[in-house]
Structure formats: C-alpha cells, structure tokens
Amino acid sequence: SSLVGSEMCIRDSFAGLPPHYTYATNKFSAACGTTFATASFFKNGAMNLKVGILAAIGSFAGSALGAHIVLMLSDEVLQMMMFIILPIAAVIILWRRNLPDENRDDGTLNLKKALLALGIGLGIGLYDGMVGPGTGTFAIIAFTSLMGFDLRTANGNAKVLNLASNYASLFTYLSSGLVVFPVGIPCAISNIVGNIIGSHFALRKGAKFIRPMMLVVLVLLLGKLITDML
C-alpha cells in the first residue's frame, strides 16, 4: 500500500457502511498509513522535495474540491462513478505498466516544471478526492512520463502528493462528521504496518519491487470491478 495506496482493498472492509461514510473512514485510514510511508521516503532522500511540495499544493486543492463534490453526490451516483472510472483506471495502468527506470531530470526547477508539478498534483488530487484507487500508481506514471524521474524518486514524490490529498479529503470529511473511528482505527493500524513494510521494500528493491506492484494494482482494480458487477 505504500506504493499504490490501499483505497480499493480497505473500502471492501467497510461493507455495510453507506458510501459517504466508507469514503471518509477509508480516507482516515489511508492518511495514517501514507504519513509513515512519506516519512520513510523523506528519511532516505528518495524524493525531489521541491517538486513534491509543489505537487502537494496542487493535490491538496484538488482533493479538497473532489471531496466536496463527493459530498454533493448521491450514493447511487457515487457507485455509478466508480463503475465507470475503475475500468478506465485499469486500462491506463496496463498501458503504462512498463515505465523506464532512468532519471532524466536535470535537477533544476524552472517555471515550466513548477507548473507541471502543480498540474499533476491538482489532477491526481481531484481524482483521489473523488475516487481513490490507484492514485499512487497514477502519480508515479505522471512523474516518470511527464517529468523524467526514475521510479524510486517518482514514488517518493507521489508519497508527498498523496499525503496532501489524503489530509485535504480527510479534513473535509471530519468537518462533516463522516469518519467512523471504531472501524477506521483498526484499519489505520493495518495500513500503517503495510505502508512501513511496503516502503522498506520499495526503497531497497526499487524498480524490481515497484513494477510488479503496479501489476498487482491492475489485478486489484479489475477484481474490484468484477465483484462490483456481480
């Protein structure tokens, strides 16, 4: 979960909760886990902090907007939205699963790169606030394909972006009283453990670990789509 996020796995643990409560409680759990994963990548210097912060600013705004949109939608619309978006997400991950693991970034930060980082954060943050599954993988794809980072650094940048988007959505849901803490706290503990373990392997193994995990995300997305159809 430190690589791709755990939205699709954890939401299934909230069976019986209305969709809005599921979104909110899941976001609490995800925010807790992502905090520890981000700390691990920061400690190991596996991120471009300037790019990560700019992306986080965009992500915070996008995710807050996405969460507010979710609150305005009915349960039926939310379920239909997931049904439409998940197969599209799966296709994108399948198409871009074999990402190059080379750092083509020259280390400078000009206006073009700054705006690109903000744009990546805004777009992925909006997706995370409204949908969630695969957010980390989409961020890695964006940072490698559009900004030329290697997989390890792209993963670290994605952590900063995802941290901001998680907390932006969480603050929105907390203000609406939608987080079910008796359910969310045990899931948060599991999420933290998973993120710590996942970060350890991602940092040590790099692309050898990250690429297979992207395929795992694809399988989980497709699996969720199939189960939702049944």
What are the functions of these language-model segments?
Residues 1-5, 9-10:
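Single conserved hydrophobic/aromatic residue that forms the stacking wall/gate
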Residues 5-6, 122-131, 169:
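Transmembrane alpha-helix interface/packing and boundary motifs in multi-pass membrane proteins
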Residues 13-14, 21, 67, 71, ...:
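Transmembrane helix-loop junction
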Residues 17-26, 50-54, 148-159:
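Membrane-interface alpha-helices at helix entry/exit sites of multi-pass transporters
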Residues 24-80, 84, 166-216:
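Selective hydrophobic functional segments
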Residues 36-46, 83-109, 222-230:
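Transmembrane helix exit motif
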Residues 110-126:
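Small-residue-enriched transmembrane helix starts and helix-helix packing motifs
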Residues 135-137:
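Extracytoplasmic gate region of multi-pass secondary transporters
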